[in-house]
């Protein structure tokens, strides 16, 4: 039986390590520690403000969280920093998978889960 959510994701690496992130807690930790997730958002926000000359007020304090959202790689459910949701992400914070799709496809892709604290504790991001 085919699944409408599968559209070329076969290219995703099998046995990938994913980190379970529960929002808004994940954001609150990132903001407090200024970890790599926070740094990624801050870098994107600064680039946006520099390019457009607008939105500088969002670089102050926790407002910066409004610059980020992602979608599940499979069903396109939206993740935001201030909405209660659980997503799984790759170490580079590039791919995000909602809890439902993770549950449905974890065996197929042989994903492994590590504690998000391992990811949150890292301060550098490429």
List the predicted regions and their residue ranges.
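Short metal-binding segments enriched for Cys and/or His
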Residues: 61, 95-120
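Canonical RING-type zinc finger of E3 ubiquitin-protein ligases
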Residues: 80-92
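Short cysteine-rich clusters marking metal-coordination/redox-active sites
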Residues: 72-76, 98-101
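Short intrinsically disordered terminal tails
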Residues: 1-2, 118-126
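Short metal-coordination and nucleic-acid-contact micro-motifs, chiefly zinc-binding Cys/His arrays
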Residues: 65-71, 91-94
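Short Cys/His-rich Zn2+-coordinating modules
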Residues: 6-62, 81-84
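Short functional micro-motifs and their immediate structural scaffolds
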Residues: 79-80, 106
């Amino acid at each position: 039986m085919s699944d409408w959510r599968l559209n070329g994701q076969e290219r995703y690496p099998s046995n990938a390590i994913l980190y379970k992130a529960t929002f808004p807690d994940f954001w609150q930790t990132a903001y407090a520690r200024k970890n790599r997730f926070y740094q990624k958002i801050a870098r994107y926000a600064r680039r946006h403000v520099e390019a457009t000359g607008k939105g500088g007020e969002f670089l102050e304090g926790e407002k910066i969280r409004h610059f980020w959202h992602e979608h599940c790689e499979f069903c396109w459910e939206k993740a935001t920093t201030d909405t209660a949701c659980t997503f799984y992400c790759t170490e580079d914070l590039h791919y995000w998978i909602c809890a439902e799709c993770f549950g449905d496809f974890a065996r197929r892709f042989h994903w492994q889960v590590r504690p998000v604290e391992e990811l949150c504790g890292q301060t550098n991001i490429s």
